[in-house]
Amino acid sequence: ACAYTAFANEGIVTRPFFVTRIEDKNGRVIYSAVPEQKKAINTAYNYVIVDMLKYVAKVIQGKFKSQIAGKTGTTNDYKDGWFIGFTPEIVISTWVGGDQEFIRFNTLPDGQGAVMARPFFEKLLQKIESDNLLGFGKNSVFMKPEEEMIEIDCSKYETTTIENNEEDKIKKSSDFDE
């Protein structure tokens, strides 16, 4: 989950912490957490990755006020299912599985991360968004950086071919559609 904080935070990794502050009985703050942060990836590259991960979560986006992105995961033999999802303000990682080898699902439709772990992410984020006491920023979106971006449309990077030289011709994905 720590690595995904970079995607949610414009390329800056934030080390997770659990206690944000401690007050004494009189309300004086005796401890306040200072998040440990480090630049991990260029902002423009980070946005491209986030844009791809938004596509993974597209099927559930309509359930949320904030933009979301995420990634599913499934281990061999459908023993573990993962979903790590995030908004610009929070990263949530969910896991469903067993600690014994014999505890597993028998088929991919039942045992994939999108089926067994993602629903927990969905329920938790819906609760967080609906709880006004948490101060969670509703309707938050991933901001596109102002710097020059690389194109996500791969067709812009296709190499041109020399028609007379058969060896140099490059097959395109559409050539394999037959």
Question: PLM ranges: what are they?
Answer:
Residues 1-166, 170, 174:
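A penicillin-recognizing enzyme superfamily signal
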